[in-house]
Amino acid sequence: MLVVSSHDIPGKKIVKTLGLVKGNTIRARHIGKDILAVFKNIVGGEIQEYTKLMAESREQAIDRMIQDAEQIGANAIISVSTTTSVISQGAAELLVIGTAVVVEDE
């Protein structure tokens, strides 16, 4: 599955547009990791626990979007974008959306 943020794929032509596909995940913070994050906020630096959590969330949301696209017969997804939103205190949603298409070599 080709997944790109651009509106086209070099060397490919879009032969069919299938529509919007999406994948999301909602993650809650972990109290133990929050304690480590508080210390990082005091001394500065990257909060690796949150970086890892966001990376895992992004991969899961992308995998779910790909499954959505495969179910409708797509072999590529274009115009992919991500967004996050706060669901509740301590929980956030990561949403990935794109346009499912069928592409062929030019």
Put a short name on every predicted segment.
Residues 1-33, 71, 94-106:
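N-terminal presequence-like segments and the immediate start of the first folded domain
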Residues 6-9, 82-87:
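Short, solvent-exposed loop/turn elements at beta->coil junctions and helix N-caps
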Residues 21, 26, 34-81:
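Short, well-ordered alpha-helical segments
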Residues 88, 92-93:
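Membrane-proximal amphipathic alpha-helices
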